[in-house]
Amino acid sequence: MFGQPYVQDCEYVCITEGPLDAMWLTQLGFPAVALLGMSMSEKQRDLVLTLPTKEVILCLDNDSAGQIGKKRAMELLGNKIKVSHINIPEEYKDVQDIKSYDILSKVIKNKRYW
């Protein structure tokens, strides 16, 4: 999982599909890791559960594959950790497309719980 060693104690961690998305979020001050694909594996779930955080925010791409990935991650994480997800506005493909800190911050703030 990309970025896992760099996550320090934090309230939440954003989970993205790709490393560029995770780097973009980290650059803007949002702790993030990347799955390196659309779907979380059981091994990745186990790694997520070792992260020093109380919540994960699923920030997967704004396409059908991202929706499938959200569902899979939720099934794997279940009630093991607090899980939420963001709704990326239609005009953006993924979090890296959101160049405004203010917009991205609002999207993350408006996360939804399952």
Indicate where each model-derived feature is located.
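TOPRIM fold recognition
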Residues: 10-13, 22-114
